[in-house]
């Protein structure tokens, strides 16, 4: 079956955009094919710094014919309806339509629309130009004289050529007749800009990928990554060193080269006095190079791995020397930052934070630090931390933001603060908290274990959330400019991973009170936000979101650890036959109550009359007794936080509830008896509310 080959060659595409662009190209083209009724066997997208490529295998040469029957208005319908039907069906007159008879509704017009299958080549030529014109680059540009014209082509970098062919593997494929921005599709591409700048004639994918390989272009980004990684490991091993692997840097570097050549450079050993993290940040950020460790050690070696896009005639000596000069200059800067920063104590830097605005409505960083310190001191006893150490750590936690090193490398915030604090003799817990108070940064990041770190981390995140809630800067849809979802997830993970008992409303209130002179946060709304984040977090671990809703619907549910334990007990209960049947009985009772309360215009929320129930049917009396006992037992179990015991108490209701619905008529002719039986159903609803709001549970 025929294949499609598409290449869009341009000036250098930013590395961070390449992989997403390749996937976008595949999705746009395959979606367009499927929408037009064309199926295919497989599709692969590729990217290099200078091209996006797509190969779709197993396309039909021609689409299948389509026969569609479209029913129109009733015979004798108004003229406007008839004309609308004819226009929609593409018919010139009713003579081209037939009629069908519906035994119940009468005679109707019917249009039989037959569309012959179209040549795949024609269909591709129809939609490919529009895909190129509307391609979803995060940033794009116009260029050349045509850029002044309205609607001129936009691309991430100037587009230079298009290869677009379609045909069977065993025959010479045809060029798809497309032209975009004055660039007509053809069969000519180019290899490596410097190593093989000559034109290459290609026809089909197998020819294309082999021709590029000969022209010093590795088309597959994952293969380029593999080449870089293994060559770097081998080169390091040959020198008795270990590569410090960096997936993010590897991904970026593989997008900077079409023909990766791995080389090793070195720097003066005196630079190893600089913290290893600073050396790595310097070499990574400025030169896109990998650092190395001494063999079998955690200590850095005075060497680095660089990746060139050239096969140099001198074996890469000039390229390596050039990189070494730049690395030496950058490390000299880093050493200056390190020595300069060590000369000033962290607390002496705090006045500078008073001049840095955190947010125009939330004051300066200095004001924020004062709030975090007060909150950390208050939280400390609740998490087993020393209040004085927690307050001290919070006061110093942001001081490194005004150091030279963090000013140059913001990603080192916290880490450099920890090192400077250790040098000035701070307590180990204070040092750890300065680095760890930013954690956890995501669902898989490590959660701090030191109580002082936990206190400061909670204070930092709660202050952020309460502050932005107070000024109504909440996340909306996909927008979360202040990373409030991440902050809430951080609080949740700190509480759950460390088994902390905290009343969130109380802590939000404390954070709120520290925002003196500013409007307070809506604590209930913020608690709802925590509930949403908790649902996302637990759902990823297999928990049911409706059970979380059912627990949060109860009053006073701001102790997240207890919420989760209650959810776990509820899930275990509902997995049993007793749980499933009780839920079904609850749903039936709630449905009856809803109907009768709506009909009567009143709520049946009074306690049932025990004497009246005792005088009624045996099943009625048994349910009344079981409800009273189960509610009392469940309430006591919840009070001592024995949620499994509470569920066990509810499980005793299964048999009497089943018997009640089987043997008792709720809507009895006697009004008093009917009212009391409805009150019994309400008592069932009230009993289940001891553990959760069953109305929120699905199923």
UniProtKB/Swiss-Prot annotation:
Q: What is its main location?
A: cytoplasm
**For this UniProt entry, which segments traverse the membrane?**
none
Reaction(s) this enzyme catalyzes, per UniProt: tRNA(Gly) + glycine + ATP = glycyl-tRNA(Gly) + AMP + diphosphate
Instruction: Write down the Gene3D superfamilies for this protein, in alphabetical order.
Output: Isoleucyl-tRNA Synthetase, Domain 1
Q: What class of enzyme is it?
A: ligase
Q: List the EC numbers from the record.
A: 6.1.1.14
What are this entry's molecular-function GO terms?
arginine-tRNA ligase activity; ATP binding; glycine-tRNA ligase activity
Domain of life per record: Bacteria
UniProtKB keywords: Aminoacyl-tRNA synthetase, ATP-binding, Cytoplasm, Ligase, Nucleotide-binding, Protein biosynthesis
One Gene Ontology cellular component term attached to this UniProt record is: cytosol
Name the Gene Ontology biological process terms.
arginyl-tRNA aminoacylation; glycyl-tRNA aminoacylation
ATP-binding in keyword set? yes
Where would you find this protein in the cell?
Cytoplasm
Q: How does it assemble?
A: Tetramer of two alpha and two beta subunits.
Q: Cross-referenced HAMAP family, in alphabetical order?
A: Gly_tRNA_synth_beta (MF_00255)
Q: Which protein family is named in the record?
A: Belongs to the class-II aminoacyl-tRNA synthetase family.
Protein name per Swiss-Prot or TrEMBL: Glycine--tRNA ligase beta subunit
Which species?
A: Methylobacterium radiotolerans (strain ATCC 27329 / DSM 1819 / JCM 2831 / NBRC 15690 / NCIMB 10815 / 0-1)
Q: Which gene encodes it?
A: glyS
